[in-house]
């Protein structure tokens, strides 16, 4: 993304993305996580069409180029999750904890893809604006306990969201 916190938009073309992916794989990466919408603090939500346009070149071609490497798509939007899974994406990483779209939790629960259940209060745009916890560790633990019951605990990674309002 043009406003990415990880690379500052250096790999925002299909060609540059694949060159960086090859470099990461050659360095030992076995999972590649890509996103078309920045989730850095203060970032704004973008239209799903723009997000898919940014992702689709990699998502549509990844498995033909890198059969043994897992592809993770970082998105909050159900539409992007669906499209990505049509191209055999291995993992969906949602910083909203599958709560941005009211139907994403039930959708992803039915999917065989691995999932990253993330903790964040608010949105990327607001998460740093005075987040409140009774006890940060217990609050996060309770969040995961509650949401793992909803999503199921098979094929789920949990991400406490360090830097996302903590």
What are these model-derived regions, one by one?
Residues 5-6, 30-58, 162-166:
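Glycine-rich, proline-tolerant flexible connector loops at the mouths of alpha/beta enzymes
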Residues 11-34, 64-67, 82-91, 99-113, ...:
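Alpha/beta enzyme core
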Residues 41, 81, 101-102, 125:
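Generic structural signal for helix capping and beta-alpha/helix-loop junctions
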Residues 129-166:
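Catalytic alpha/beta core domains of metabolic enzymes, predominantly
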